[in-house]
Amino acid sequence: MHTQIRWLNIPLFLVLSLCCLVLTGPAQAQSSLSPGYAAGDAHLSPSARAGREIWFYATAFNDRFYTYSYAQRLGGGIDWYRILAANNKGDLFQAWGAVPDPDCCIPGDPNCSAKSLEETYGFQWCPGDAKLLQFVGREGYDKEDPACVFKDAPFDTTTPHGSVDQRQSACDLRFGTSTGALGLRKFPNPRFDPEKWRKLNGSLASWEAYGKFLSEDEKSGDSRFNRLFDGSIEPPFRIGMSCGACHISYDPLKPPADPNNPEWENIDGLVGNQYSRVSQMLASGMEPHVLEWQLIARARPGIVDTSALPMDTVSNPGTMNAIYNFDSRPKFLHRVLKWRKASACPEGPSATCWCEPQRTNKCWSRSEAMEPVNHILKGGEDSIGAAEAIQRVYFNIGSCAEQCWLNHVPDLRASDPAQRNYGQTPFDIGQCRRDCPSFRAIEDRLGNVVAFFQTARPADLHAARGITPQQLKAQLDSEFGAGSVELGRQVFVRACARCHSSQKQPYERVDFHAVVPDDPITPKRRVDFLSNENPIELRVVGTFAGRAMHSNHMPSRIWAEYAALDLRDRRVDPELREIMKGSGRGYYRPPSLLSVWAYAPFMHNNAIGPEVCGKPANKNNDFYSSPYVDQNDKPLANPPPCLPFDSSVEGRYQLFKLSMEQLLYPDKRPRKVTLADEDIIVDVAPNVTVLDGVEAGLSIKIPKGTPALKLNSLRYKDMLQDIVLMLRDPDRLEAKYKDILSPERRRELVQGLQQVRAELKPGLTFDLTKASDDFIQAYYSNVLGRVENGGHTFGKDLSDREKQALIAFLATL
């Protein structure tokens, strides 16, 4: 494989401000806008009801992030019209895995309040739009947002914050109205200029020209960017995202007859969307050959790399988990340094104790204490408390970006270590609380979200089939052989429970289906979480390494304040092959097996099991690319087909069985390695002016067919920095690696850097030899593993009879 490097231009962008007018009018509560949604509140406590509404609708002002900061600061582009155009309603689920909003309609359809696409700027008509559309191109919607009449749950008077309700204004939750896809919310853009829009697109209903690229000259950097990056023309809507965008999906117990047209009774907010193409959504306005597309969009359905924006140069997409039996999740005693509620602050710095202005007794004190906490995320990295982990999700999806975290994330093309945003710096929770009203609005209501989480119960297969547990056992024994469920239980006790049970040994005496008796707060909660939640070294589980090397919670990284002090001090797995390991420690937390029948394929990256895909009518939005390769990592000549999305009970069950076959027979798994399906251009260095005024910037071209991980987990900045040190300050390079590499490895490092430098010949283009490419991967890749569906071979030595029995038993959990 040859890696080609060349010089090319990198464009800059501006945002122009427009003057706006003001309208006024009464806001409407979200529950009154959607009776179908409100029906789901009937069985909930006031606190859980409030938490559900926040989970489904609150964006916490991240619409600004996706409209401005995402493109201008991080180089990402989203073509919202490509996703959300009313005429694409039938493809929302098939192309993007999005859940269509049952309350929205296509303008012009019978019984739809909007009669033309001009009225809605090409989008669907949704509840609340009669008010919202009045503010397109005008100021004033912030006070008319449905969040402003959000019905708060009763205030908790038992905390140090006292008995007076001093919660941040609910307006700062920022709901907007639906886009037609649940979890994606729209807001009127006060900067919108209808005349500019008509001139560009020919109609208020169209966005077509807005998505076209700025230049047809392939030699120009503008050929890789479109109007989404051009601030001189702004769209009619700003689009925000709630947590529900990734977690709302179809209820395994009541799936829709037509997934393209669900009813509210088919929808659950906590099951996790295993069909979601949110990664492709976030890159929908970019060409596949640019770096940002590769970093963001390289994910199969149902997984997303949550560190792609606060980039840690580790490609580690993970599943959007179902949230079941929250109160049964194990907790562990850890050293936790965090902010806790206080009624007053002594004299001292605000960095350790701070009281909110114009509030009484509403203070926060930062201190260290031993505290029982959950292990959240795939490696247990979120480890200072469940409430804090929930709030961090809002930052991961763009909330408080300008006030709190954009200046802590790296610029992908900052090549000078002394340059601002060359690398990560830690997010400051105290500073964000002080400066971002949306932080406080969410934080003041985290208890409500937790209360909503506590309502989720497993989706049992017997309930999905409408039969009793005894009848299900009889069906499974008939399918897999007499006595299979009981034999499978014995196999589970012997081979699985050590990792996949939260109860104590001896497991022979454990009832894995038991519920907590007479629990008035969380009725029918299962006793067993079906995971011990203890992080396991990667070498033990053996699955794809990417997620275990996630490093954003380590010291000096962006989410450092969200990690327990002792948990992040775990040793690096000594058997990792990477020579200079990234900051990740190399651990995985065993996933819960609750309702495992409904959530195949398996593993943190959905890679063990058949590939699944939607079947969109618009083939330009068909993102399936076969990952199947031969032993030489070349595309398989006749790869297995992907299975179509199927949310039905039988569809989930059949996918479960096929995935279990691959899990328990690892030698039969077809090899999966994601390859670049287009040439990839990586703009590395900023523009410089050379002779005759020519502007150029360093760029790397990765050819089609290269394993995507060669790029996605490459610390190319470190490599460039080391080349400079080798040339200008070799003593400093020696000191940098003295405590990391052996003398032999340090000599090999210098020799490799010299070889790479020698191949940087004068001219606009040069090639790297295979030897240099191998050196770069060995020394500068955070993840050397390429096979995505390897590992977890624990059941391979079971007999065929035991394997089939285990599948039968797992179907009952």
Each language-model region and where it sits:
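Bacterial N-terminal signal peptides
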Residues: P11-V22
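Periplasmic c-type cytochrome electron-transfer domains
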Residues: Q4, N9, L23-L813
